[in-house]
């Protein structure tokens, strides 16, 4: 879906694979709990391909549905101990966030990552001053996950927005579906879990697929290129 950028008041960003790379810590946490449960961890690349839906969905694929609940319990307990390991901000992220805010456009995180971990990571990476709101999961009043329509409606309502006044930038088909379920414009960066070909397949076009945030900011928003 193309966007009328003159109407955009807020840009929502996915977190993992879009703003930050936290995959090494996620893998370490998974591998640690898998070994605790007597399992042989699958490879880093296998894990990376499963991230995006929810931790329950990810662990169901990695350790099986029968063990997923126990795995989630262990993962949630262990992740705060390792979540800052090897985490970094992806290229162009600070640049695009600053440019959006200078243009008067609000920025928000819209993620399936748990809310507390999302806030802690944004604080640790010093991105919080560039973010107006954070929407994460595992909160009492927010039981949904992308791409459930209710979650997309929830973030729009909290930001007092209609879908045409917002845009979602992500890195996976979950993000595309989450935006489309409410008619929100969506763009993707190929810096996370899916290659450009997979993103083009799920969107049906390469028009809104970009290699990184620098390319997206320049080509879509016409920001001055980073030197």
Residue ranges and their predicted role:
Residues 167-207:
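Acidic, Mg2+-coordinating phosphoryl-transfer loop and its flanking beta/alpha structural elements
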Residues 42-46, 129-133, 163-167:
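Short acidic capping loops at alpha-helix termini that bridge into adjacent secondary structure
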Residues 35-37, 58-65, 86, 94, ...:
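Substrate-recognition/cap helix-loop segment adjacent to the acidic, metal-dependent catalytic center
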Residues 10, 146-176:
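Conserved Lys-Pro-Asp/Glu-containing loop-to-beta segment of HAD-superfamily phosphomonoesterases
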């Amino acid at each position: 879906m193309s966007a009328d950028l003159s109407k955009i008041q807020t840009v929502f960003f996915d977190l993992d694979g879009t703003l930050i790379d936290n995959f090494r810590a996620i893998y370490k946490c998974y591998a640690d709990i898998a070994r605790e449960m007597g399992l042989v961890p699958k490879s880093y690349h296998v894990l990376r391909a499963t991230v995006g839906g929810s931790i329950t969905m990810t662990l169901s694929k990695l350790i099986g549905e029968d063990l997923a609940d126990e795995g989630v319990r262990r993962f949630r307990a262990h992740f705060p101990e390792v979540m800052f390991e090897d985490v970094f901000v992806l290229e162009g992220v600070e640049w695009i966030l600053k440019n959006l805010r200078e243009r008067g456009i609000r920025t928000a995180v819209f993620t399936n990552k748990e809310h507390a971990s999302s806030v802690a990571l944004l604080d640790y990476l010093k991105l919080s001053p560039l973010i107006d709101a954070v929407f994460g999961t595992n909160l009492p009043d927010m039981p949904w996950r992308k791409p459930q329509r209710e979650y997309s409606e929830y973030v729009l309502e909290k930001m007092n927005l209609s879908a045409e006044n917002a845009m979602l930038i992500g890195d996976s088909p979950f993000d595309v579906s989450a935006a489309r379920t409410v008619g929100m414009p969506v763009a993707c960066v190929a810096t996370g879990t899916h290659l450009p070909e997979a993103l083009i397949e799920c969107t049906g076009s390469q028009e809104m697929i970009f290699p990184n945030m620098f390319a997206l900011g320049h080509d879509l928003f016409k920001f001055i290129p980073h030197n």
